[in-house]
């Protein structure tokens, strides 16, 4: 946890060191959201209200949101406060899922490469989690996020659960179709995760895949 906190502070310092250009302006409130098909049933819906201060390269954005599945499960509500400076930044997120868990997460990220088509970010994170039955645990780690201008992407994440074990995760997304304004997309997704230490280390890797249609508005 201490190492993760140091990394978060280091990345935030990098963000502060990057010079900014352009005037600061107040943005209007933006109501947006998304609706995505879920192979397990129903559709995953999200509604969010955001307001930011700054310009596209240097800003602070606050957001409140609600997300859930149209067929089953409780609705998760929460809020995020994010700071961005030329691709570097940090965020604080608090979520509540009734009858399931409460999570408070801190994250910092730094842009490593961006040529207008390919983007690569490094991130560190820490979270405090409390389940509905009172059990509490922490999660911290680091990862790399890659994205392509055409909607493809991948992420590699290493997570540490103090007192439980460590886990390695890989997620990928291939965009098969997009509407002209990219508001609606058809994506093929895949994921893999494996416990690398702890009592679950002898379990087989967990794989997942899906084909989903998503629409974003706002």
From Swiss-Prot:
Residues 18-28 form a propeptide. Changing residue 108 to D: In strain: 2CPA-7. Hemolymph (at protein level). Its main location: secreted. Residues 1-17 form the signal peptide. Induction: By bacterial infection (at protein level). It is found in: Secreted. GO terms for biological process: antibacterial humoral response; defense response to Gram-positive bacterium; defense response to insect; humoral immune response; innate immune response. GO terms for cellular component: extracellular region; extracellular space. InterPro entries: Attacin_C, Attacin_N. Transmembrane segments: none annotated. Keywords: Antibiotic, Antimicrobial, Cleavage on pair of basic residues, Immunity, Innate immunity, Secreted, Signal. Hemolymph antibacterial protein. Belongs to the attacin/sarcotoxin-2 family. This is Attacin-B.
């Amino acid at each position: 946890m201490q190492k993760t906190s140091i990394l978060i502070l280091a990345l935030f310092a990098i963000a502060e060191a990057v010079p900014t250009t352009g005037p600061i302006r107040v943005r209007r409130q933006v109501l947006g959201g998304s609706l995505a098909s879920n192979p397990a049933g129903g559709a995953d819906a999200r509604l969010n209200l955001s307001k930011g201060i700054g310009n596209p390269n240097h800003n602070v954005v606050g957001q409140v949101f609600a997300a859930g599945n149209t067929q089953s499960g409780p609705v998760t509500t929460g809020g995020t406060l994010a700071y961005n400076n030329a691709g570097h930044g940090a965020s604080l997120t608090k979520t509540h899922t009734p009858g399931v868990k409460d999570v408070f997460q801190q994250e910092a990220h730094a842009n490593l490469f961006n040529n207008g088509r390919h983007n690569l970010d490094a991130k560190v994170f820490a979270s405090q989690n409390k389940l509905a039955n009172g059990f509490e645990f922490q999660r911290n780690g680091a990862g790399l996020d890659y994205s392509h201008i055409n909607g493809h992407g991948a992420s590699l994440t290493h997570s540490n659960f103090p007192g439980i074990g460590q886990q390695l995760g890989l997620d990928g997304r291939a965009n098969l179709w997009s509407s002209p304004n990219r508001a609606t997309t058809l994506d093929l997704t895949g994921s893999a995760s494996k416990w690398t230490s702890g009592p679950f280390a002898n379990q087989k890797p967990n794989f997942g895949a899906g084909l989903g249609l998503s629409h974003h508005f706002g």
